[in-house]
Amino acid sequence: MSKPWLFTVHGTGQPDPLGPGLPADTARDVLDIYRWQPIGNYPAAAFPMWPSVEKGVAELILQIELKLDADPYADFAMAGYSQGAIVVGQVLKHHILPPTGRLHRFLHRLKKVIFWGNPMRQKGFAHSDEWIHPVAAPDTLGILEDRLENLEQYGFEVRDYAHDGDMYASIKEDDLHEYEVAIGRIVMKASGFIGGRDSVVAQLIELGQRPITEGIALAGAIIDALTFFARSRMGDKWPHLYNRYPAVEFLRQI
């Protein structure tokens, strides 16, 4: 029987598909049982993020087709972190699961999917990475509006590692977090953090020109966002960092 393929996609700021990072480090730990295809030709850019995601989606689709068409007996798994989780989530939701999807013919060969810090996380669907951060609460979901749905009904297994306090992967459905979703939408489309009408700062100013009754929730969302990004310099204490070893063990269960 053919070795299964593992496709991995790095997060923002990690364009080297072979470099250090959760997906690649996880793959290196299971090379005895998987063939590994890291996704390159993908800038993993912070700004503008959505075009970067689209390039990652196109490359992941291409590599899945190339590898699985060449070996009709090979199963496969996918793993993505942060922006890479969006790439994997987009391919899964829009190209593998729909009967009309370009990759739907491979659905029965998909065995495992791993996400860390997933902005497309399905509400209430979260797993512990057995580390220092608590797992996301049952009433939380990913920050993007285009989220995964009904993952429990499919034949493949999923681990969606999400921490409480990870703004990308764990928000609630209330007024404050509605603005965090809007901030997430801004990050996807913005040309940069500051400078120009399409920067994050300019778009936040525009978002702030809302009725005064909405001001408290908006201010809270902006404070949450700025606090979250500031904590990225805190090392392991940043909730958007994850422990890979439960994912390694999960992949080994084949």
From Swiss-Prot:
Active site, per annotation: 82, 166, 240
GO terms of molecular function: hydrolase activity
Pfam family membership, one: Cutinase
Coiled-coil regions listed: none
Gene3D superfamilies named in the record: alpha/beta hydrolase, Lysin B, C-terminal linker domain
Taxonomic superkingdom: Viruses
Key word Hydrolase present: yes
Family: Belongs to the L5likevirus endolysin B protein family.
Protein name per UniProt: Endolysin B
Lineage start: Viruses, Duplodnaviria, Heunggongvirae, Uroviricota, Caudoviricetes
Gene behind the chain: 12
